[in-house]
């Protein structure tokens, strides 16, 4: 399972969880799976795809301000644990943990 967190100081502000084999959109629109209501974030900014193998890919959805991985603008990229995904002025830090199907998990923002 992948976790994306925005941080304010040392405290997480938003946390998103992605289970294996899912596709989620991130943006400021209500129809986005993960809503980030911040300046410079497009309505549908990027798509996150978790493969059944555990790999996480990001694809920019023609956002106005671009999608960045570790400071580099990307159209598509494979993400790794510890990477920073930037949408608008929001940085999301990525973490990966093995998925335990017996554990209760939440998808979406908290």
State the predicted function of each range.
Residues 1-4, 89-110:
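Regulatory inter-domain linker segments that are low-complexity and enriched
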Residues 2-7, 65-67:
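Short polybasic amphipathic segments
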Residues 5-11, 43-44:
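Phosphate-binding glycine-rich loops and adjacent basic patches that engage nucleotide phosphates
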Residues 6-8, 50, 96:
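Residue-level signal for short segments within beta-strands and strand-turn junctions
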Residues 8-10, 64, 98:
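Solvent-exposed strand-loop boundary residues in beta-sheet-rich modules
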Residues 14-89:
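Forkhead-associated
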């Amino acid at each position: 399972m992948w976790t994306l967190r925005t941080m304010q100081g040392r405290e997480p502000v938003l946390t998103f969880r992605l289970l294996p084999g899912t596709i989620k959109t991130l943006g400021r629109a209500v129809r986005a799976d993960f809503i980030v209501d911040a300046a410079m974030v497009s309505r549908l900014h990027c798509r996150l795809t978790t493969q059944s193998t555990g790999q996480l890919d990001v694809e920019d959805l023609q956002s106005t301000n671009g999608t960045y991985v570790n400071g580099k603008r990307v159209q598509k990229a494979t993400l790794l644990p510890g990477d920073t995904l930037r949408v608008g002025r929001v940085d999301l830090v990525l973490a990966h943990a093995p998925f335990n199907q017996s554990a209760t998990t939440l998808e979406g923002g908290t």
